[in-house]
Amino acid sequence: MSGEALDEIQWKSPEFIQERGLHTGNVLEYFSLSPFYDRTSNNQQLMMQFQFQQIQIPVNTTFQQFFQEKLREMTGVVFVIAYNREPDFWIIRKQLQLDPQNAVTLQDYYIIGANVYQAPKVYDVLSSRLLSSVLQLRNSIDLLNKMTQFHVSDGGHSYNNAIHQSTSNPTQGQSSGKSISATVGNTGTTATPMTMQTPQTVGPNGPATVQSGANSAAAISKNGSTSSAESADDRKNIYLDDIPLYGRGSTVEMLGLKVNLES
């Protein structure tokens, strides 16, 4: 356990808790069993003295209070109870006692339930937070670099890489172009301009529709020529037949007119 970092481990003694429990009166003794304890401290020396000497504790004073008062009278490294909140929380402070009124804090430890931890230093906390922030920032910058590409047509770096997919992947671009061309060739329709060779025929229900394509144009041209010939024949039959002006079957008879031929 000596090779491990003390701020990365936790320690507890279930045997001590089961036998004696844990309270403010014995919490320093419980802490002295942990690897965080310094056996060269004044606590260890004072405990050895109390073990082999008869100590007269003043009236209305607990052993823990008397022990803490004796520690303040000594100079050197000591462990004291800095804060307690029974029954499950204590803060043990390691400090350099200069005199009964002055001390320099060296390290804090806290006990939660039966577990003992070493409190991290401010330097370690800030280093960990800054390292985490820098790592996240680096990942974000790498992601932004992957999202942008340099294109001469854009005049610099651009986030719109969709329009440059054909440039980055020529094979895919060619295949896409072929598929688009095939689709347009199969489904696209355009209006055919009216010429003398492809006349537009007018039927009783409205103008006829002119379709594009070589086959359709040829069919329309053929049908247009046939229709033109039939129309010419009809006009010839209508206007060139010999219809008498007077007499049976004449225009005057069909219109029901009376004409005075003697005048």
Swiss-Prot record:
Gene Ontology terms describing biological process: regulation of transcription by RNA polymerase II
Primary location group: nucleus
Biased composition (Low complexity): 182-202
Subcellular location: Nucleus
UniProt keyword annotation of Transferase present: no
Composition-biased stretches (Polar residues): 163-181
InterPro entries documented for this protein: Mediator_Med6 (IPR007018), Mediator_Med6_fun (IPR016612), Mediator_Med6_sf (IPR038566)
GO molecular function: transcription coregulator activity
Keywords: Activator, Nucleus, Transcription, Transcription regulation
A GO cellular component annotation in the UniProt record: mediator complex
UniProt-annotated stretches for the region Disordered: 163-232
Subunit structure: Component of the Mediator complex.
Similarity annotation: Belongs to the Mediator complex subunit 6 family.
Known role: Component of the Mediator complex, a coactivator involved in the regulated transcription of nearly all RNA polymerase II-dependent genes. Mediator functions as a bridge to convey information from gene-specific regulatory proteins to the basal RNA polymerase II transcription machinery. Mediator is recruited to promoters by direct interactions with regulatory proteins and serves as a scaffold for the assembly of a functional preinitiation complex with RNA polymerase II and the general transcription factors.
Name of the protein: Mediator of RNA polymerase II transcription subunit 6
Organism from which the protein derives: Scheffersomyces stipitis (strain ATCC 58785 / CBS 6054 / NBRC 10063 / NRRL Y-11545)
Name of the gene encoding the protein in the UniProt record: MED6
